[in-house]
Amino acid sequence: MSTVQRLNEITANLGVLYAKLHQHHFYVKGQDFYKLHELFETQYNEVHEQFDEVAERILMIGGKPVSTLGEFLALASIKEAPYTTEKSGRQMVEETVADFELFRTQLEAAIHSDIDEVSQDLLMV
């Protein structure tokens, strides 16, 4: 798999993760509302920064970053989860942890693959 392909998979996962974190931010309720509302906002802002950096790296190496929701959903291993039933704050946190664990596994695989060193360094921060 080429560096651009690997980075596009990461971009897709960041796009889906960004949307899911926003969803949790919008819908969180209950006694932990303020704490979780702020946490999800912090996380989606950090994911947005990573998303932008990875897409810019793809452009720097002559590739085209995926940029549509359809492309994100087709390439991402993190799956969207429509908010059809109410979730507790705990369920949202558990879902977020599972998504980040899946994403970490993907990052580790990319770092240990044959992608270029600059891209590896970008993924390690």
List PLM regions with ranges.
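Disorder-to-helix initiation segments
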Residues: M1-I10, G89
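Helix-loop segments that flank and shape redox-cofactor active sites
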Residues: S2, L17-T42, R104-L122
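Short, small-residue-rich loop/turn micro-motifs
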Residues: H25, F72-A76
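Acidic/histidine-rich alpha-helical segments that form the ligand environment
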Residues: D52, E56, A76-V125
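Generic structural signal for well-ordered, non-transmembrane alpha-helical segments
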Residues: N8, A12-G15, E41, N45-D52, ...
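Long, contiguous binding/interaction regions
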Residues: S2, F33, N45, P65, ...
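Conserved alpha-helical segments that form or flank metal/cofactor-binding pockets of metalloenzymes
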Residues: K29, Y34-E71
